[in-house]
Amino acid sequence: MYQSLAMAANHGPPPGAYEAGGPGAFMHGAGAASSPVYVPTPRVPSSVLGLSYLQGGGGAAASGASSGGGSGGAPSAAGPGAQQGSPGWSQAGADGAAYTPPPVSPRFSFPGTTGSLAAAAAAAAAREAAAYGGGGGAAGAGLAGREQYGRAGFAGSYSSPYPAYMADVGASWAAAAAASAGPFDSPVLHSLPGRANPAARHPNLDMFDDFSEGRECVNCGAMSTPLWRRDGTGHYLCNACGLYHKMNGINRPLIKPQRRLSASRRVGLSCANCQTTTTTLWRRNAEGEPVCNACGLYMKLHGVPRPLAMRKEGIQTRKRKPKNLNKSKTPAGPSGGESLPPASSASSNSSNVATSSSEEMRPIKTEPGLSSHYGHSSSMSQTFSVSAMSGHGPSIHPVLSALKLSPQGYTSSVSQSPQASSKQDPWNSLALADSHGDIITA
């Protein structure tokens, strides 16, 4: 925009084209080139410039023409350029964002002096500062505009020369702020455990209260269960009733079903072989037919069906011996067996001695004179000699019985000390013989 003004100032018509004034009626080329007022404000978008000058273009041109006419003595807005100045500014504002300067025309009207151009630039800067929030200069206007924009609320109203543009932006920002603030104000975050709102926490804590409060199954009345379930109406069910309802679709019956009949009394079953209905164990044959335990075992062991003649009305049980008796007898048996061999050996030895002695005594009794020929032991010879000398037959029998019983009487001593058995036997017989001899002789 300012470049077009500079070009118009440099390449404008010569003095006196439209006015009768001297060279001061129009701005000079050198002054226009060196004037600092033609520097545009920093980072001002063209759309804002177009919108800002859309309404004030004609007024600025009129004020510039009137000031120029007053200073230079030219009639105010009398030339045709003044009449065509407003269409030029309005065309520039109507273009919007893409601003294109109008073509340079010799009939375009400009202010007469450099001072009037400076006043026009100052007025434009003031309007821009007012639009951005009332800053002193170009940089101050930009900073103040940013601060004013940052401090403004999302739903606030803006007083600006372009209300349509900022109203749309403000409305969109307000809607975005409301949308972004919506999730944070929703009751979802208030129900988090970290919140201090007890009313919002209560619904979430109901799940944990189920474990602390006492529950009762509405179907069976159970007070404890591994897992609490709920039916379609929300009532509590124990794990068993809940699973039954889930699988079968009906409530679990409260009456417990009767126990399955024992195998011996199953209704409708009979042995395919013997036609019995009572057994301790039902089996199946090769064809899959039920058979009693007896027929099934017989077929399994012998490979042939059990004969009907072996059928019995009652169930025959096996007579088992008690295991305690076997355990009590087994430890006593070996001990008795171990103690028996020495006793048997001692008794056999003693019996052998007794038989030999009895055999020797028999010929002695018949032939007393031959007693000297059987001198096996002094005790025996003394005994036989005493008996022979006395000649009393009946008195000899107690001695013989004592002699026969003496080995048996000392079997216990022999079993206790078998080492001294050989030495004690002659001495025992001698002592008995002497004692009986004394009795006999007396």
From Swiss-Prot:
Lineage of producing organism? Eukaryota, Metazoa, Chordata, Craniata, Vertebrata
Q: Where is the composition biased (Gly residues)?
A: 62-73
SUPFAM superfamilies registered for this protein in UniProt: Glucocorticoid receptor-like (DNA-binding domain) (SSF57716)
Q: Which Pfam families match?
A: GATA, GATA-N
Q: Which InterPro entries would you find in this protein's record?
A: GATA_N, TF_GATA_4/5/6, Transcription_factor_GATA, Znf_GATA, Znf_NHR/GATA
Q: In which domain of life is the source organism classified?
A: Eukaryota
GATA-type ZnF: 217-241, 271-295
Q: Assembly and partners?
A: Interacts with ZNF260. Interacts with the homeobox domain of NKX2-5 through its C-terminal zinc finger. Also interacts with JARID2 which represses its ability to activate transcription of ANF. Interacts (via the second Zn finger) with NFATC4. Interacts with LMCD1. Forms a complex made of CDK9, CCNT1/cyclin-T1, EP300 and GATA4 that stimulates hypertrophy in cardiomyocytes. Interacts with NR5A1, ZFPM2 and TBX5. Interacts with TBX18. Interacts with PHF7; the interaction promotes GATA4 binding to its transcription targets.
- What task does this protein carry out? Transcriptional activator that binds to the consensus sequence 5'-AGATAG-3' and plays a key role in cardiac development. In cooperation with TBX5, it binds to cardiac super-enhancers and promotes cardiomyocyte gene expression, while it down-regulates endocardial and endothelial gene expression. Involved in bone morphogenetic protein (BMP)-mediated induction of cardiac-specific gene expression. Binds to BMP response element (BMPRE) DNA sequences within cardiac activating regions. Acts as a transcriptional activator of ANF in cooperation with NKX2-5. Promotes cardiac myocyte enlargement.
Query: What positions are modified (N6-methyllysine)?
Result: 300
Major place of residence? nucleus
Which keywords does UniProt give here? Activator, DNA-binding, Metal-binding, Methylation, Nucleus, Repeat, Transcription, Transcription regulation, Zinc, Zinc-finger
Name the Gene Ontology molecular function terms of this record: co-SMAD binding; DNA binding; DNA-binding transcription activator activity, RNA polymerase II-specific; DNA-binding transcription factor activity, RNA polymerase II-specific; RNA polymerase II cis-regulatory region sequence-specific DNA binding; RNA polymerase II-specific DNA-binding transcription factor binding; zinc ion binding
**Where are the compositionally biased (Low complexity) regions?**
74-94, 331-358, 412-424
A GO BP annotation: aortic valve morphogenesis
**What name is this protein filed under?**
Transcription factor GATA-4
Keyword Cell membrane among record annotations: no
Query: What GO cellular-component annotations does this UniProt entry give?
Result: nuclear body; nucleus; RNA polymerase II transcription regulator complex
Q: How is it modified after translation?
A: Methylation at Lys-300 attenuates transcriptional activity.
Q: Which SMART domains match?
A: ZnF_GATA
This protein's species is: Canis lupus familiaris
Residue ranges of the region described as Disordered: 62-107, 315-379, 408-442
Name its cellular compartments.
Nucleus
Compositionally biased, Basic residues: which spans? 317-326
